[in-house]
Amino acid sequence: MWENGNIDVFSSSSLGALIENRIPAVRIEAFADANETDALITELLEHACRTSSIEQVTRLGISQYEQGVRVSKDNYFKLARHLDPEFAQIYARSFSPVQRLIGRLKKKGFDSAIMSEPGMGDYFAGNGKLRNGYSPVHVDFAPQDSASWAIAKARAQLAWNLYLRVPAKGGELLVWDKQWQPADDRHQVDGNYYYDEAVVRDTRMVRLSVSPGEVIILNSRNYHAVSEVRDRLAFGSFISVFEDTRLRLWS
């Protein structure tokens, strides 16, 4: 459980506390400047492959769950190899948030890289999310839904987002001081990824406002949601945390 409800600045100790679920989130201020975010917005909206799993979100890139778990592992890695050159060009004309974050993590002493799957190659890592609506209460935790994938061996999972375009109202991040357990699945809404709000009833929650150019990292095994918002654009991925302290990024 959390020691407090504070959002800590990025450091090796704060990231360790987040992995251990002792704090709600970590913030990296001024991760990218306005020129960089504007360039990335333009490139993503004009050139990125668009996929969508729910009405409220247009994904600029692919998802291991949607294109992998719900279709096949072969399909996901085939798409990943197809999109790698496309996103390399996007980053060449703007910048790569994924590689910048990996560099920041390495400077803090973490063994960080793109996740790979034995016999399949590297995962796709980093996609945009154009949000029009809200995100209901849910978790993102590979051991819950991806048993046959290497990411299921992680002891913890983080999610990070770089906020590119943030409207004046809405789009707050809600995080609860409760981590998913198998028994919670009785609250999962049939045929959907999200949960009835009863799963977090009477649980401590923090509400985070976000700003363009900053990164928020959370423990994605914790229940979280996003409040109603129009035309918000973010970019990020997951980070699997393994027993040997390796951090591996994937989407």
Which stretches of residues belong to each language-model region?
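Catalytic core of non-heme Fe(II) oxygenases with the double-stranded beta-helix
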Residues: 131-205, 248
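N-terminal auxiliary "cap/dimerization" subdomain that precedes the catalytic jelly-roll/cupin core
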Residues: 1-86, 90-95
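Residue-level detector of short, conserved catalytic/binding motifs and their immediate flanks
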Residues: 24, 156-158, 162, 214, ...
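Catalytic core of Fe(II)/2-oxoglutarate
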Residues: 190-251
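Generic detector of solvent-exposed, compositionally biased contiguous segments
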Residues: 1-17, 128-136, 140, 202-217, ...
